[in-house]
Amino acid sequence: GTGSRGNSTLLETPNAKVLIDQGFSGTQLAKRLARLQLTPEDIDCVFITHHHGDHGGGAKVVQTKWNIPVLANERTALELDLVPELTTFFEALDLVRVGDDLAVLPVPVPHDGSDNVAFVASHGGERAAIITDLGSWTDELVAHVRGCEHISIEANYDHNKLMYGPYPYSLKDRISGRGGHLSNEQTGRFLAEVCTETTRSITLTHLSEKNNAPHLAESTVLYYIDEVFTGDLRISAQNGPDFSHYVGAETAASPEKSPLN
């Protein structure tokens, strides 16, 4: 599921099961995994993008309740007060290997006074990008995401709904600022830069319940990528898991699986 009330994405290969973010309670996480015929004990580790509660608020509970290792950068780990014995720090742009068939690259992105990162996961010669909570992007991010077979990215708000909505000006300014979130138009422009003929699927995530709507996100993004993308575009809901995308060798059971999105 993705949204302001919690975020988590499952990456599954034949030899690894990894969560990207854990913003749910332990009970909620267990319920959502059960819908995939999984338990928390099946999870090998959790990667955290940044310390905000809807992304990392449930990270410590997986350590204390199920002894699941968590990987985060140092600031994120300290902000979340993670259990030292079950925490591994990573550095931006240092490739992290999980088992023998999954590699995860953290790529820095700007967001609200946090050391936020996107992740580019590699399996079977193909790549999946998970990008959330950023108000702008860098050439570095474009370079690492371009040509990924799957891209999961936030489309947080519709500009008009945000600006004419009930939020105070200070909050509107923060959301729409360079360290805030991506609008539907920004997401469309970013995707137009990174989509290639190899890009098969896109998932739009983290839609604001007050400042966006699925049909607005989809139509706006498609306007920008219609000439460069012919694959599968889906929108992730807060109450997921909804669906899966597969990346990697066709013989693999589920090389990249994002049903918690």
Predicted regions and their residues:
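Metallo-beta-lactamase
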Residues: A72-G125
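Conserved beta-strand hairpin/beta-sheet module of binuclear metal-dependent hydrolase folds
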Residues: G1-L36, V117-T132, H150
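Active-site metal-binding motif and surrounding structural segment of the metallo-beta-lactamase
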Residues: S25-A72
